[in-house]
Amino acid sequence: FDNFDWHDSILNSVIINRQNLGLNDVVELDITWPSGERGILLFKNVRKCVINLNSGIDTKDWVYNAYETEDDEDFVSYKKQVVNICNDIDKLKCFVIETSTTGSFVKIFAIQVVERSSIDL
């Protein structure tokens, strides 16, 4: 996740797929990378998603920073809340995407993130 070329990529869309409710909730990010290529990131086995998106602004949502962290306050608090009911908590990761255009952010607490190539789109 940290190895993607995030700075100046564009966050095109965020899709929350709950068709397999509670078993494998998925968050899908549609990204245009600085190279112009489009990519889809699938966050699988999502346990929580915190989205603070500012809408109504007529411009693309440029990514300022994106990173994986163990120290996010919301993530630490969430893990404390579910430690006794979540049997795979040690596999849980926190992914944060921050935008520069609107000051928005997305935090995804998930077990796994995979890239779906543009060939699959």
Q: What do these predicted ranges mean?
A:
Residues 1-121:
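Surface-exposed, interaction-prone regions used to assemble/regulate multi-protein complexes
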